[in-house]
Amino acid sequence: MERTIAVVTGASSGLGKEFAKLLVRRKEIDEVWAIARRKDKLTELKKELGEKIIPFSVDLSDAGQIISWQQALEKQKPDIRYLINDAGFAKFCSYLDLSIEDSLNMIHVNCDAVVAMTLSCLPYMNAKSKILNISSQASFQPLPYLNLYSATKAFIRHYSRALNVELEERGIQVTAVCPGWMMTHLYGRATVGAKKGTHKFYGMKKPGPVARKALKDADLYKDMSVYSLYVKGSHLGAKLLPHRLVMKLWLYQQKL
């Protein structure tokens, strides 16, 4: 009998790990293919969550490694029920502190890799399969000193919602998950070396509840998942107010 698979990128920590925890508990999922760069973290994850975890060490900023992943899929031809594109890269700073290398890595991991993972997994997905792409509250409007990160997350939100319409005929659901600030290592790493940048993270939440709501919303065939009243208020404000004003309010909040 064909194994049913959930694929989770960025699975070794943070929100990705919370998704992995939830998916291993689902009886309909035989294996969770956990993708991350660090083999040691993946080994720890397997010890913690059990035999359902199948680790794959893949650097999603490397196109060659993504192609190797695609070739592994072609050999195994799994029945993919869930694809969670959680892997992300962030630098919260002025353009002056953002190198060309970091800029391109952010685009590769946050945008290119999501598209590549989605296209590589779609041939092995069927009706009722789910794709959850992690966008952000930052996607709702342009954000100075978060300019590239917010732009990559806006790409993910629009890509996911448009793709969801295209995949309706196949019965595959795509959900853009738009969390606010979360208690993960991403934010500590993102501010390292920034002389001037984002440093006030209001409405910080634990990633577990965000993951639970995201899966629930995907199962309810919602094309967006927004957790917490704070983030919902931010979304409404970004729709009602001119973005020039929203950016000024953002700068005032961050004291920039």
Residue map of PLM features:
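Active-site helix of classical SDR
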Residues: T118, T152
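Conserved glycine-rich Rossmann-like NAD(P)H-binding loop of the short-chain dehydrogenase/reductase
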Residues: V24, E28-E44
